[in-house]
């Protein structure tokens, strides 16, 4: 295979500066010189040091390949490592997002009811797609929702997500469950083996929405007991029947012994909110999981009467067991390395063909762009530590594959807030309908070519309103067949992404 034919894009990405650094590695902003688009290249270091971390990375790579939707972050490409059996780092590339919802809430007190409605609609629409694929996110919180100045949100960080199959042992869901307590459903408080349903994600979305309305977390529990205490302060003491369904004995005893509390009316807790919004929020924050609406039911709520359109709220095909068979067995570092390598090949169709046909070389495969990225990342990291923003030396090599970087995490944010941009994000009158009767929020001011703000990176933004094509047309352009695990006699002509 002629590497320089398939990967002759060595000068396409101009690496600019470090925009994030943490235990996982480093994220650099870069310019796609072909399109003028800002991207972020994330280097994840030593991914096989711990099998649990490598498994989380594999899980996320797989899910972001399979769950392609405008409200979910999208991996476009992953650089092919130079050696199949010896690589330790991976480089993934996303378009640059300016911030996350945590920063938006923290920095912006000018959000309007239209913002609240549109934000919740996007989250529920993305969640419907996730849940109909039989996937449960398990870690929804403002830091895992990316935002840009077009008011576009994208769900990210699928490292704790799980795929639910009818015969999957319950324990598989909870082997590494460490989701943030503040957004954790009450049936999960203190229990790693509670009944597992999509309602846990609906609860999290309800907590996020309440935080949007008030500007502060709704249930900032200091521990499990305090978490249950402040939940019941708002919702009232649950019924005896509801308490009996909580599997954790200590939690059951605590709830049974607490003084009887009356629920606080949501109109009192959120005095300035739209009554329709509060009615939906109250349903989403039901103590009993069975009383919460699923994402599809929530989208049909009267609160969204002016923007909902079922044609733009697609369902996903369920994820196949074959994609996640590794969750059902004990795997070694070597197993994980091979599985991650196999998934990376989805972005390199020619190499995938050779791999499936058994003709691929097992050793050093080509003059890798990764080697050149290493030098530039090392240069930037050194200068980043000294506070310099100097750009790295230009590469003298033209073998860089196309992009793709990974999910966000909880590293401390040094994000320049997007309050100015977002406060100027003018929302269209929500009685004004878009194409085929669906209203859409529009940003009259879209940042053009400004410096990327440090912070979260990932996923492309779906433009709303002032666009050359309608939302539906943009979505249809993105809608391609999901890529199930390939049989040994099948090769995807373009990989799983355009």
From Swiss-Prot:
Q: What induces it?
A: By jasmonic acid (JA) and infection with rice blast fungus (M.grisea).
Q: How is it modified after translation?
A: Dually phosphorylated on Thr-175 and Tyr-177, which activates the enzyme.
Sites where the protein binds ATP: 19-27, 42
What are the GO cellular component annotations? Answer: cytoplasm; nucleus
Identify the residues that the record assigns to the Protein kinase domain, covering every copy: 13-304
Example GO molecular function term? protein serine kinase activity
Composition skew (Polar residues), residue ranges: 486-498
Segments carrying motif TXY? 175-177
Q: Which UniProt keywords apply?
A: ATP-binding, Kinase, Nucleotide-binding, Phosphoprotein, Serine/threonine-protein kinase, Transferase
E.C. designation(s): 2.7.11.24
Q: Mark the transmembrane ranges.
A: none
| Class in the EC hierarchy, top level | transferase
User: CDD domains, from UniProt?
Assistant: STKc_TDY_MAPK
Coiled coil spans: none
Q: Which family does it belong to?
A: Belongs to the protein kinase superfamily. CMGC Ser/Thr protein kinase family. MAP kinase subfamily.
Q: What is the recorded name of this protein?
A: Mitogen-activated protein kinase 15
